[in-house]
Amino acid sequence: MLTLLPSLILLLSTLSLSTPANAGAAIAKAYYPGWGSDDFPLSKVTWSKYTHLTYAFAKTTKDGGLTLEGSNPGGLKPFVKAAHENGVKACFSIGGWTGSQYFSTAVSTPEKRTAFVKTIVDFAKKYDADCIDLNWEYPAKQGIGCNTIDKDDTPHFLSFLEELHAATELPISAAVGIVPFNDAAGNPITDVSGFAKVFEHIVIMNYDVWGPWGSTVGPNAPLNDTCAAPANQQGSAVSAVNAWIKAGMPAEKIVLGVPAYGHGFTVKKEDAFQKGSTTKLAKYPPFDNKNRPNGDKWDDKAGKDVCGNDNPAGGIFTFWGMVDNGYLKEDGTPKVPHRFDDCSKTPYVYNPDKQIMISYDDAKSMDHKGHFIKNFGLAGFSLWNAAGDYHDILVDAVRHGAGFKN
C-alpha cells in the first residue's frame, strides 16, 4: 500500500481550496512534435503560453549517434529560431517511445559515454539549443519491445549524466515514469539524490497510466488514485510525486507531465452505462481488447512497429481530434454522454453509436492538475504535446490552476 508523505496528505485534504498557498510555478513547457509540423506549423504555436518548448525527437542510433529521421530533420533550426524570437527557451529531446532503442548501448561503457556526451554537446551547439531533454523509455526496463537493455542501465545513466553535466552549461532535464528508475533487480531505486544534482528538473509522465493493455477502462492521467479501490490504484500524479520526493528529488525540481490526448476503448452499450441508465456512465467498464478503435487522423494505424511487430491501431484521440470526431463541442465541453470521476479528477465520454469510450483530460481536470502543481510547490507543467490542444483550452486551464497569468 502507498505510504504518503505527511505534507502530501495535508495537500490532498485541501485540493479543493481556491486560494493555494504557493506563489506559483515557473515552468510552462510543452513538447513540439517534429513529425506533425505539416498539420501544426510553428505559426500555430501560441508562444506566449510557454517558457520552454521541446522539439521531439532526436532518436538514438546503433553507432551512438542521433538522428532526426521521422521528426522533420529540417524543422529543428527554424523551431529554435522561432522560439528565440518569441523569448522562449528552445530545447530538444532525445529518445521517446520509438527512439530509445540504443540508449542502453550508448551509456554502457566509459568510452561510449564520453562519445555520446560529445555527440549531444555538438548537436546542441549545431542547433543553438538552450536546453537538453532526455526521454529514455526506460532504463533497465523494456519499452517498445526491441530496446537494448542492461540491468545496470540506471548507474550507467547517472555516470553519463554526470559527465554530460560537466561538459555543458546547458540545463538538462529528463522525462521519467511515475516511479523512479529501476535497479538491477527490476525495482524502483530508493535514492535519486545523485540524479537531482544533475537535472535542472524532471518531467513526470503522468499519462498512459491506464490504456488498452489493461482489462478495464481507466483514467489515462489520474491526478489521484489513493481514493480508488486497491485494484484500481495503478498510479497517479499524487503517488508519482510522492515516490520521487521520497527518493530524494526536491519538489521544486519536479514538473508534472499533462496530456492533450486520451485513450479510446471499444465498450458495449450494456457495459458502458450504469445498470438501468442510458445516460450515466459506468466506472471501470470492461472493453473489447480484440477490437481497438481507430483514433483521430494522427493515431498510429494498424501495422508493424519499429521492432517489426504487428500492432493494432493506437486508439489515441488528441483533444482537437475529439472535437473533429464529434465527442466534444468547439468549446471543449462534451457532446455525448459524459462522466467526471471525482477520485482521479478526469473525464470520460462515450459515443453509443460507435461504442467508443475515451478517457481524457479537459479544462476542469487540467485546472485541478494546475492547482496541485501550485499547492505542492512543483516547478510547473509540461504538455504532451502542444499540437494536441484545441484553441489553447487545455494549456489555458493548467496555466490558470498553476498560477500563471493567461
Curated annotation (Swiss-Prot):
Induction per the UniProt record: Expressed during the biotrophic interaction with cacao.
In terms of SMART domains, this protein maps to:
Glyco_18 (SM00636)
List the InterPro entries.
Answer: Chitinase_II/V-like_cat (IPR011583), Chitinase_insertion_sf (IPR029070), Glyco_hydro18_cat (IPR001223), Glycoside_hydrolase_SF (IPR017853), Glycosyl_Hydrlase_18 (IPR050314)
Q: Where along this sequence does the record place binding of chitin?
A: Y138, W384
Q: Which UniProt keywords apply?
A: Chitin-binding, Secreted, Signal, Virulence
GO terms, biological process: carbohydrate metabolic process; chitin catabolic process
Per UniProt, subcellular location reads as:
Secreted
Q: Name one GO molecular function term.
A: chitinase activity
On whether Signal is a keyword of this UniProt record, the answer is yes
* GH18 domain mapped to chain residues: 26-405
Looking up PROSITE patterns in the UniProt record yields:
GH18_2 (PS51910)
Pfam families attached to this UniProt entry: Glyco_hydro_18
GO cellular component entries: extracellular region
Q: What is its main location?
A: secreted
Stretch forming the signal peptide: 1-23
Q: Which PANTHER family match?
A: CHITINASE, HAP41P
Q: Could you say which protein family the record assigns here?
A: Belongs to the glycosyl hydrolase 18 family.
Q: What else is known?
A: In plants, chitin acts as a microbe-associated molecular pattern (MAMP) that is recognized by lysin motif (LysM)-containing plant cell surface-localized pattern recognition receptors (PRRs) that activate a plethora of downstream immune responses.
Q: What does this protein do?
A: Catalytically impaired chitinase that binds efficiently to chitin, but not to chitosan, xylan, or cellulose. Despite the lack of chitinolytic activity, retains substrate binding specificity and acts as an effector to prevent chitin-triggered immunity by sequestering immunogenic chitin fragments.
Q: How is this protein named in the record?
A: chitinase-like effector
Organism whose genome encodes this protein: Moniliophthora roreri (Frosty pod rot fungus)
Record gene name? Chi
